[in-house]
Amino acid sequence: GSSAIAKVTRHDVVIAPHAVHHIFPIDTLMGDLSVQGEAEKLIVDRPDVIFHLAAIVSGEAEANFEKGYQINLDGTRYLFEAIRKAGGGYKPKVIFTSSIAVFGAPFPDAIPDDYFTTPLTSYGTQKAICELLLADYSRRGFMDGVGLRFPTVCVRPGKPNLAASGFFSNIIREPLAG
C-alpha cells in the first residue's frame, strides 16, 4: 500500500540548510555513524525507510585507509547492527547507496546483475563488503535491504573534492558558476 510521508529525519556530520517550507516535518540530527552508539539514536523512532548515503568519497578513502574503513564500513555496520538489535519485529526498508567502484576494470558496456565484484580501490572494497552485509542482514530478516550502484550520488556544492566521480559535479557546477 501507499501512505503519506509523516516525517523525514536527516542525519549528517554537518548540517546542510534546507527549504523552510515543506509539506511534512523535517527533523535534523547531527552525528557520526562511525561512532558506536550513534546509529541507535536514529533507530529510536523506528523509521519505515532508511536511505543510507553516508560515506567518504573514493579519493579520500584511498588516501586515508583507516578513515575510509571507519566511515564507509564501520558506520554502515553500526547502522545495520542498531537495526538488528532494535528487535520487536522491526524490519525497515534500507536503501544503501553503493558504487560502480565495486567493479574493477575492464568491464563490459552493460554490466549484468550477476557480474562479479573485483574492486581496484579501498573505496570499492568497502562498498562491496557493505553490499555483502546488506544482503546477509536482509537474508536473515533484520531488514529489507536494496543496494543501488551509482556512478555518483549528488552534485556537491563548493570546490571540487577527492571523489573519482567529481567530474560529474563539475559538469553541473562549473556552468552555473559562470
Give names to the regions the model predicted.
Residues G1-V49:
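N-terminal Rossmann/SDR dinucleotide-binding element
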Residues H11, I50-I56, V94-I100, L148-F150:
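SDR active-site strand-loop-helix element
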Residues H21-H22, E60-K67, A105-D109, K159:
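Conserved catalytic-core motifs of eukaryotic protein kinase domains, centered on the activation segment
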Residues T28, G68, V94, G145-L148:
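Hydrophobic/aromatic anchor residues within beta-strands of the central parallel beta-sheet
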Residues L33-I71:
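NAD(P)H-binding glycine-rich loop region in Rossmannoid oxidoreductase-like domains
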Residues R77-T121:
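Conserved Rossmann-fold NAD(P)-dependent oxidoreductase catalytic core, especially the SDR/UDP-sugar
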Residues Q126:
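Active-site helix of classical SDR
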Residues A135-G178:
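NAD(P)-dependent short-chain dehydrogenase/reductase
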